């Protein structure tokens, strides 16, 4: 696993990125890795307990949450949709050689990819996986 890595997920888009984080753990990798995960509410955070455990035990791993709907009392994470300022704050410590993987709803993935490009990350260092309605009816 070459790095550093910036992983960005929205909703259930966390599933393939968690597989990458688990692989990182299994390989005993210390590649600097940051995950920025957008959820509607704290109750919608998939793998919340596992993420807490991983951050506590995996050197070089940082996990950052943003909630777009409701934040519980005392919330210390981000409280808005992912934007260029948030990406800059999370990604800058990784340096300019980072690679990014973005997975989630189409609108989130396209927005994040555009913002990463605006921050100067070359398009060939941004990998995306998106999902959403197909638009067809049966």
Language-model segments: which ranges?
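Surface-exposed beta-strand edges and their flanking turn/coil or helix-capping segments
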Residues: 1-2, 10, 20, 48-50, ...
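Short helix-loop-beta connector
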Residues: 1-4, 94-96
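The start of beta-strands in P-loop NTPase/AAA+ ATPase cores
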Residues: 4-5, 124
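Conserved beta-strand elements of the Class I
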Residues: 5-6, 101
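Conserved hydrophobic packing residues within short motifs/helices of P-loop NTPase cores
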Residues: 6-8, 36
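Alpha-helix N-cap/helix-start capping motif
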Residues: 11-12, 106
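Histidine-anchored nucleotide/phosphate-binding helix
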Residues: 14-26
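Reductase modules of NAD(P)H-dependent flavoproteins
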Residues: 25, 31-138
């Amino acid at each position: 696993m070459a790095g550093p890595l910036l992983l960005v997920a929205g909703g259930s888009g966390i599933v393939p990125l968690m597989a990458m984080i688990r692989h990182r753990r299994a390989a005993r990798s210390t590649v600097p890795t940051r995950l920025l995960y957008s959820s509607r509410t704290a109750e919608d955070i998939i793998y919340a307990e596992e993420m807490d455990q991983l951050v506590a035990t995996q050197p070089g791993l940082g996990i950052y949450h943003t909630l777009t709907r409701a934040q519980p009392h005392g919330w210390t994470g981000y409280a808005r949709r992912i934007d260029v300022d948030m990406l800059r704050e999370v990604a800058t410590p990784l340096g300019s050689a980072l690679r990014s993987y973005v997975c989630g709803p189409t609108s989130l993935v396209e927005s994040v990819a555009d913002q990463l490009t605006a921050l100067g990350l070359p398009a060939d260092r941004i990998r995306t996986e998106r999902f959403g309605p197909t638009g067809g009816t049966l």
